[in-house]
Curated annotation (Swiss-Prot):
Stretches with biased composition (Basic residues): 491-508
Domain of life: Viruses
InterPro entries associated with the record: Capsid_L1_Papillomavir, Capsid_L1_sf_Papillomavir, dsDNA_vir_gr_I_capsid
UniProtKB keywords: Capsid protein, Disulfide bond, Host nucleus, Host-virus interaction, Late protein, T=7 icosahedral capsid protein, Viral attachment to host cell, Viral penetration into host cytoplasm, Virion, Virus endocytosis by host, Virus entry into host cell
Organism field: Human papillomavirus type 1
Recorded GO MF terms: structural molecule activity
Subunit relationships: Self-assembles into homopentamers. The capsid has an icosahedral symmetry and consists of 72 capsomers, with each capsomer being a pentamer of L1. Interacts with the minor capsid protein L2; this interaction is necessary for viral genome encapsidation. Interacts with protein E2; this interaction enhances E2-dependent replication and transcription activation.
Disordered, as annotated region: 480-508
Name of the protein this chain belongs to: Major capsid protein L1
Subcellular location per the Swiss-Prot or TrEMBL entry: Virion; Host nucleus
BP GO annotations: endocytosis involved in viral entry into host cell; virion attachment to host cell
NADP found in the keyword field: no
GO CC aspect terms: host cell nucleus; T=7 icosahedral viral capsid
């Protein structure tokens, strides 16, 4: 019997060939060419204090007399450790300076924060607030006329975060963009583009109005509070740093963000015909005031809500076992960059001083001031590590960062040049010979000299006596390296039985 289900089926020719992907350069993990020793050191900073005005800086004769110290700003610490290659070790077997170099490996960190918990208030005396859009009582459609700015204050979005790496952290924000040769009419909305930049000390965090360049995109200077109205709010570019090839900018991070919208307002300003509400989305009204539509430019005031010590990321120790990137905590060039954002201690100090000898109260008799203070303390546990000076390791490190080899006083051989060169006599003073050559610019030894960081020098604050410091004692206990001073063994007491004949017998 013929099986109809086994008939031959014709298929068209498949002329598609799938080739294997192109090989990529393999990025090595630091565990593959860095050897760790059993030597650990503790490093701690002094008490780091900061005092200033919470909303803006105050200048006199074009000189800043009182800096801006906002609780909503990033603090970026550039921590420098001592060069371990200059240490004098008693044990000569620790490393061979002819074939090895020493580096630090981060094992523990604690970021201490002083001052009580508090909510910082920010605002603007002329904030663009047209009307209440949450519970309106009147239909306001005069958004294109007059001046409706009000004195408004609120608390910002609550943020706790810190980020650790051996290179500066990257941030992202939105700003205006213009194509070459494009004509932009006055009043038109510009193009916007994302900008990636280094997060510097003093850069503003996102407080609930987005990561953007407010100086370029909000020319009315009244849409956001004073501390960000002419600033750029940046947000850490976690995606970019997570995909970084060498993993130097972000060993690990911790963050906690929370926000809700407290009030809903409308903005003043002309919406324009280009972005008017399409008539297909509503039915027209027959009578005023609804024949003219109100503005659709809505905004909500952020609020970070309650702060609590139960959800604090700071004042606790963190132990580094495995980083998310290829750099497993190696502090290249003996430095770390600690990016901190924390506005849970944002209380502003209100200071009032008498300006005359009057003994009665009047607003005119006192001068009021605002100050904000911040307190930090940084502690680290670092491990001594070795790198063998093999050609493969040196070539790989030179590709990653040539400055590392320069710090190690190693140079890469240059290709041979022409041994015969021209040397003119009186070249600098003679008008007959050719023009003297320009002196080559001095090589830049610090690639981050154009950025602003809080410098923390720990070159003389390192110790191998871990038990003398709080973080060191925690590390000894967590790692099981604590030396026990007393044995826990106990001696069993002998039981004695006294018979009626007063003879002592040892219990069997």
């Amino acid at each position: 019997m013929y099986n109809v289900f086994q008939m031959a089926v014709w298929l068209p020719a498949q002329n598609k060939f799938y080739l294997p992907p192109q090989p990529i350069t393999r990025i090595l993990s630091t565990d593959e060419y860095v050897t760790r020793t059993n030597l650990f050191y503790h490093a701690t900073s002094e008490r780091l204090l900061l005092v200033g005005h919470p909303l803006f800086e105050i200048s006199s004769n074009q000189t800043v007399t009182i800096p801006k110290v906002s609780p909503n700003a990033f603090r970026v610490f550039r921590v420098r450790f001592a060069d371990p290659n200059r240490f004098a070790f008693g044990d000569k077997a620790i490393f061979n300076p002819e074939t090895e170099r020493l580096v630090w490996g981060l094992r523990g960190i604690e970021i201490g924060r002083g001052q009580p918990l508090g909510i910082g208030i920010t605002g603007h005396p002329l904030l663009n607030k047209l009307d209440d859009a949450e519970n309106p009582t009147n239909y306001i459609n005069t958004h294109a006329n007059g001046d409706s700015r009000q004195n408004t204050a609120f608390d910002a979005k609550q943020t706790q975060m810190f980020l650790v790496g051996c290179t500066p952290a990257s941030g992202e924000h939105w700003t205006s963009s213009r194509c070459p040769g494009e004509q932009v009419k006055l009043g038109d909305c510009p193009r916007v583009q994302m900008i990636e930049s280094v997060i510097e000390d003093g850069d503003m965090m996102d407080i609930g109005f987005g990561a953007m360049d407010f100086a370029a995109l909000q020319q009315d200077k009244s849409d956001v509070p004073l501390d960000v109205v002419q600033a750029t709010c940046k947000y850490p570019d976690y995606i970019r740093m997570n995909h970084e090839a060498y993993g130097n900018s972000m060993f690990f991070f911790a963050r906690r963000e929370q926000m809700y919208t407290r009030h809903f307002f409308t903005r003043g300003g002309s919406v324009g015909d280009k972005e008017a509400v399409p008539q297909s989305l509503y039915l027209t009204a027959d009578a005023e005031p609804r024949t003219t539509l109100a503005t659709t430019n809505y905004v909500g005031t952020p609020s970070g809500s309650m702060v609590s010590s139960d959800v604090q990321l700071f004042n606790r120790s963190y132990w580094l076992q495995r980083c998310q990137g290829q750099n497993n905590g190696i502090c290249w060039r003996n430095q770390l960059f600690i990016t901190v954002g924390d506005n849970t201690r944002g209380t502003s100090l209100s200071i009032s001083m008498k300006n005359n000898a009057s003994t009665t109260y009047s607003n005119a008799n006192f001068n009021d001031f605002l100050r904000h203070t911040e307190e930090f303390d940084l502690s680290f546990i670092v491990q001594l590590c070795k790198v063998k000076l093999t050609p493969e390791n040196l070539a790989y490190i030179h590709t990653m960062d040539p400055n590392i080899l320069e710090d190690w006083q190693l140079s890469v051989s240059q290709p041979p040049t022409n041994p015969l060169e021209d040397q003119y006599r009186f070249l600098g003073s003679s008008l007959a010979a050719k023009c003297p050559e320009q002196a080559p610019p001095e090589p830049q030894t610090d690639p981050y000299s154009q950025y602003k960081f809080w410098e923390v020098d720990l070159t003389e604050r390192m110790s191998e006596q871990l038990d003398q410091f709080p973080l060191g004692r925690k590390f000894l206990y967590q790692s099981g390296m604590t030396q026990r001073t007393a044995t826990s063994s106990t001696t069993k007491r002998k039981t004695v039985r006294v018979s009626t004949s007063a003879k002592r017998r040892r219990k069997a």
